Amino acid sequence: MANHPSAKKMIKVIKKRTMVNRMRKSRAHNYVKKFMAALAAGNKELMIETFKKAESNLHKCVNKKIIHRNTAARKISRMALKLKAFDLQQQAKAV
């Protein structure tokens, strides 16, 4: 247990930052899940919209050092590949 006033304050600050970081990380994760749901449903417009939001939120998490940049890059890359594959699949069906 902290004895110094500054240490007690830091415990409070850390709890607040942890909650904020958890919310931001959860928001990014939820957008990734929404993208996957749109992919499963085959809704291209929703996929593009959620991809942009997921990418933006992942980059924000990287800038605030909530997640590692390579983790965000990997998730964004995989979503982009799935979006492109879906696009190619739709074009093949149209032909």
From Swiss-Prot:
<dbReference type="InterPro" id="IPR002583">
    <property type="entry name" value="Ribosomal_bS20"/>
</dbReference>
<keyword id="KW-0687">Ribonucleoprotein</keyword>
<keyword id="KW-0689">Ribosomal protein</keyword>
<dbReference type="GO" id="GO:0006412">
    <property type="term" value="P:translation"/>
</dbReference>
<dbReference type="Pfam" id="PF01649">
    <property type="entry name" value="Ribosomal_S20p"/>
</dbReference>
<dbReference type="GO" id="GO:0003735">
    <property type="term" value="F:structural constituent of ribosome"/>
</dbReference>
<protein>
    <recommendedName>
        <fullName>Small ribosomal subunit protein bS20</fullName>
    </recommendedName>
</protein>
<keyword id="KW-0694">RNA-binding</keyword>
<comment type="function">
    <text>Binds directly to 16S ribosomal RNA.</text>
</comment>
<dbReference type="GO" id="GO:0015935">
    <property type="term" value="C:small ribosomal subunit"/>
</dbReference>
<dbReference type="InterPro" id="IPR036510">
    <property type="entry name" value="Ribosomal_bS20_sf"/>
</dbReference>
<keyword id="KW-0699">rRNA-binding</keyword>
<dbReference type="GO" id="GO:0070181">
    <property type="term" value="F:small ribosomal subunit rRNA binding"/>
</dbReference>
<comment type="similarity">
    <text>Belongs to the bacterial ribosomal protein bS20 family.</text>
</comment>
